[in-house]
Every structure is written in C-alpha cells, then in structure tokens.
Amino acid sequence: GIRDYYASRGLGDVYKRQAIDCPVYDYSNHNRSDKVQHIEPAPVLIVEGILPFVEPELCAMFDYKIFVDTDADERILRRLVRDVKERGRSLDSVIEQYLTTVKPMHEAFVEPSKRNADIIVPNGGENTAAVEMLAHHIRNLIEKANMM
C-alpha cells in the first residue's frame, strides 16, 4: 500500500500532487503483487492504513491526521472473518498470528501513534456524527479547491 510506497520510493510525489503507481500488497502471498494502483493528483488525498502516523516525515505531509479508533474485540472479529473467508486461512493460524504478532505490534506501534493524530474518532465507522462532520469538511475542501 501507500506506506510500502513511501518506504521504498518516498511519498514526496503524492505530496507534490504528482501521479504515482502505488504497489498493491497481496495478502494471500504476504508480499507485493505485480499490480499497481494508479493514483492521480486530487484536491483531497486520503491515506488510510494502520501505520501512517508512525513515521514523523510522513505525518508532516498530512494537513489533517484522523485516527479512526475501533474496539479491540471488533478488530479481532473483523480479522477472523476476513482472513478465514477472504484469504483462506485457518482459524488457528489467524488466532496464533494475532496473539504473537498483531496484538503486540498494535500495542507497540499503532496505539502510541494516536498521539500524532489531530482528531481521534471513537467507535470506528459507527460514529455517525463524526463521519458526517468529516464528510462535510472534506466536501468543503474539494469545493474550495475547485474554485481556485
């Protein structure tokens, strides 16, 4: 994803409003695929992921840093369903990975990175008031950019 692109080539092109071809991660093979996602410059660019606020250089490129916080139980349930149904993994392998890698890494990197956010949205995407407020602000930014 975009963090992989940043790590390997730098996010500077996106920041300078230049088009990029971003590598696509293949979760079934645990590696980058041969595919790329072409990203055109836009008045608003939304970078999503679990680690965008870990790197200070990356944080400095964002006008707004929004952390969508989701309950730990919800995160593990989503992971179980996704990895078993969509990625063909066994329940045991998902639980093992969660306990040995995902949970410790979340606690070591993701959770502390919330400090770098400008806004923390509790209750994930279920927080209708926050989602509507952010959508309204993003629409205003796009309209303002289109007037220039």
Where are each of the predicted segments found?
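Single conserved hydrophobic/aromatic residue that forms the stacking wall/gate
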Residues: 1-15
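ATP-dependent NMP and nucleoside kinases share a basic, alpha-helical "lid"
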Residues: 32-87
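NTP-dependent small-molecule kinase module
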Residues: 40, 81, 103-148
